Design a protein with these regions (language model features):
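Cysteine-nucleophile amide-bond enzymes
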Residues: 1-178
Length: 178
């Protein structure tokens, strides 16, 4: 994004980017861009939000396609779509939470059930909401804490790749042209 705060986040995290969101499906079956930003957790219209980023809000916009195992794709697709839509509905309108204590002092591994993408009465940081959605859908192992992920952890070769469920992968990052 185009601000000093976001430049600082990139520098501190050694990350190519400072903010992440996730393309998700809402309960109407529409593709949305689910983000946690200063205005809170919001499911934005996908095309309109990407246009905003490309025109006014970011130096660059990139995406990574999530791939599930081909052999289980059909039976899994309905369950994934339903879990995704429920999560989007539960978190839309929740507050944003960027806490240095939360991010710096959260252990990567979690022995509690708090990492299961439970959306009740929570606030989220941008990369945390992505990890929590992946966990809810069974795409990211629950042995890690969603709050421990930084935006750069979702980049090519990032920590997130090591925590993906068996057979799930993220394709290489693709930059979008404005």
């Amino acid at each position: 994004c185009n601000s000093r705060h976001h430049s600082l986040v990139r520098a501190v995290c050694y990350s190519p980017f400072d903010h992440v969101g996730v393309v998700a499906i809402n309960d109407q079956g529409d593709k949305v861009l689910l983000e946690s930003c200063v205005i809170g957790c919001v499911a934005f219209d996908l095309e309109a939000r990407v246009r905003q980023y490309l025109r006014h809000m970011a130096h660059a916009v990139a995406w990574r396609k999530l791939v599930v195992p081909t052999s289980t794709r059909d039976p899994l697709q309905t369950a994934l779509t339903q879990a995704c839509a429920r999560f989007v509905e539960e978190v839309d309108g929740k507050p944003y939470d960027y806490s240095v204590m939360k991010i710096f002092f959260t252990m990567r591994k979690s022995a509690s059930d708090a990492s299961e993408g439970d959306a009740s009465e929570r606030a989220y940081y941008c990369s945390e909401i992505v990890a929590a959605l992946y966990q809810r859908c069974g795409l990211l192992r629950k042995a890690c804490n969603a709050a421990s992920f930084w935006p750069g952890d979702l980049a090519d070769g990032g920590v997130c790749e090591r925590w993906l469920a068996e057979g799930v992968k993220l394709e290489p990052m693709v930059l979008l042209d404005g």
